[in-house]
């Protein structure tokens, strides 16, 4: 059973490859999530892909993995607060008039908020109980 449970150390960080693929495969979609107050949305999309890839490499290689898990937790919390929550709470068409598609989009954004909060918890748990390299943040 321990051998199966130990697979989580690999499966969890490698699952983030999906996000790298989404950022690189459909950059215009990733760029559409960049808040309007940030210039150059495609730059932020590609930078995000590179940083997620750096997280994966760090987590899998167990080099600076505690720091990587903690920083990734910070990133997903910031995404929840700065991207998904404002989109979930926005009145897209003003005066309470909302199409079914807009209501569905807001619902999905709220699901993204909850998903990011759960993911941040998992990342922090991995930083505390799974990470091996404690050079930077003990």
What are these regions (language model features)?
Residues 1-28, 42-54, 60-138:
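Extended, low-polarity transmembrane helix blocks
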């Amino acid at each position: 059973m321990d051998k199966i449970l130990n697979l989580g150390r690999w499966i969890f960080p490698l699952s983030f490859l999906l996000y790298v693929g989404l950022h690189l495969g459909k950059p215009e979609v990733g760029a559409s999530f960049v808040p309007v107050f940030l210039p150059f949305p495609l730059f932020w999309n590609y930078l995000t892909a590179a940083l997620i890839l750096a997280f994966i490499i760090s987590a899998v290689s167990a080099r600076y993995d505690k720091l990587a898990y903690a920083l990734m937790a910070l990133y997903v919390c910031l995404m929840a607060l700065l991207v998904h929550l404002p989109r979930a709470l926005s009145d897209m068409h003003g005066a309470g008039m909302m199409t079914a598609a807009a209501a569905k989009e807001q619902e999905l954004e709220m699901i993204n908020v909850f998903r990011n909060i759960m993911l941040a918890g998992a990342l922090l748990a991995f930083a505390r109980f799974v990470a091996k390299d404690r050079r930077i943040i003990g």
